[in-house]
């Protein structure tokens, strides 16, 4: 089984002990959509924050972090989800390939070192003219009633230069083709329909995981984020969070966004909502068993662990990326088992929710294994507990 991914891959600078109630943070919060100010739970570009604040970014990040040094980790929905698959499915016949873009600098070398310790085969276009993309992650573990929240400042760097022309043809000859966080690669993001068409023509299943699209949020704060209608139809499974779903659909709430996706022709989707219920749906024409619009509870097992010992909560960074990875794990497992030909969307929610929950227990998106199979061992008890929870919820809904 072959999985290929293209999209966001960067270095995360993690500031885990921020306080969103600090005067400095509050003074830099956005007051008008797209104005360049910080967005709690969202993303802004460093260059726009500089304009908003009237100060250089180096000074701003020093103030926001109170001068503390950050932890460093690999980030990005495309690469983190793919590494999660390779770690959890290490003993199965699965190969994972990634293509991305970096600068010829220290951060680019660091990215290759991180990935080199995994089973993912990665190739990069390396530019000497632009820095490696980075994201400064401001985490407040006490936000949202102790559930934790993170806000992002992105330095786009080389990521703005990647187009479909640089992506090798062999990457499309795959069983699963994943696009993750392409909004942070603006030129490539504009070619989503072309990328999905190439993958579908090669016979691949297509999975798209979205990310906050600040470029288009700034460009048109009131309009829908662009995503061509044909691209929706070419996306076998769309995975996004509620904020992204609302802005992609131009609606105001999660259910309206879901109904808009259905009308737009998306075959199947999963919409996460932080610590709130997950919403999923699959049409009769999708690769999944027909699934009515259904709410699924988040994983209670992880909530119980954190309630019993709040010190277990590291941060929420990478939860969405690992959720996407868990979804891909589920689909890959089902394809390997070759049951009746149709996929189970609840199983995708199960593995996604368990994987996203596990990410709360370590810093950043990438889990650094000390031995092969370590992440799988940590994940499986969560999967088992969450499966029981979802089965009970399903049985109750049937009554």
Q: Language-model segments: which ranges?
A:
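Glycine-rich phosphate/adenosyl-contacting loop at the front of the ribokinase-like
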Residues: 1-97, 312-313, 393-399
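Conserved phosphate-binding/catalytic region of the ribokinase-like
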Residues: 3-17, 23, 28-34, 198, ...
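Hydrophobic beta-strand scaffold residues
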Residues: 96, 122, 206-208
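A glycine-rich helix N-cap at a beta->alpha junction
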Residues: 114-131
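Conserved phosphate-binding/catalytic loop of the ribokinase/pfkB sugar-kinase fold
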Residues: 123-127, 135-186
């Amino acid at each position: 089984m072959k999985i290929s991914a293209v999209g966001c891959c960067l270095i995360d600078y993690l500031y885990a002990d921020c306080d969103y109630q600090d005067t400095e943070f509050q003074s830099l919060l956005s007051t008008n959509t797209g104005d360049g100010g910080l967005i709690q739970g969202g993303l802004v570009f460093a260059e726009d924050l500089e304009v908003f604040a009237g100060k250089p970014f180096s000074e701003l990040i020093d103030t926001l972090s109170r001068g503390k040094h950050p932890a460093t980790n690999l980030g990005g929905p495309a690469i983190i989800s793919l590494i999660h698959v390779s770690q959890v499915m290490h003993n199965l016949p699965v190969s994972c390939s990634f293509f991305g873009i970096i600068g010829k600098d220290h951060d680019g070398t660091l990215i290759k070192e991180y990935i080199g310790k995994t089973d993912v085969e990665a190739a990069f276009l390396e530019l000497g003219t632009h820095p490696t993309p980075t994201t400064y992650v401001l985490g407040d573990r006490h936000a949202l009633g102790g559930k934790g929240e993170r806000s992002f400042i992105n330095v786009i760097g080389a990521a703005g230069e990647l187009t479909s022309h640089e992506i090798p043809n062999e990457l499309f000859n795959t069983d699963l083709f994943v696009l993750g966080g392409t909004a942070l690669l603006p030129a490539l993001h504009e070619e989503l329909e072309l990328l999905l068409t190439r993958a579908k023509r090669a016979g691949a299943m297509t999975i798209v995981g979205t990310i906050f699209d600040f470029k288009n949020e700034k460009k048109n704060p009131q309009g829908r984020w662009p995503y061509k209608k044909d691209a929706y139809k070419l996306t076998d499974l769309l995975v996004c969070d509620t904020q992204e779903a609302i802005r992609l659909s131009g609606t105001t709430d999660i259910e309206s966004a879901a109904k808009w996706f259905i009308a737009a022709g998306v075959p199947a989707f999963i919409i996460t909502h932080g610590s709130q219920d997950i919403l999923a749906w699959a049409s009769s024409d999708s690769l999944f068993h027909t699934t009515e619009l259904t709410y699924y509870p988040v994983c209670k097992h992880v909530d119980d662990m954190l309630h019993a010992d709040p010190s277990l909560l590291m941060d929420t960074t990478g939860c969405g990326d690992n959720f996407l990875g868990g979804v891909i794990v589920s689909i890959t497992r089902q394809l390997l088992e070759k049951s009746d030909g149709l996929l189970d969307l609840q199983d995708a929610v199960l593995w996604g929710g368990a994987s996203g929950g596990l990410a709360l227990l370590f810093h950043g998106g990438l889990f650094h294994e000390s031995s092969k199979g370590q992440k799988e061992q940590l994940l499986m008890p969560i999967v088992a507990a969450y499966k029981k929870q979802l089965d009970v919820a399903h049985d109750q809904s049937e009554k």
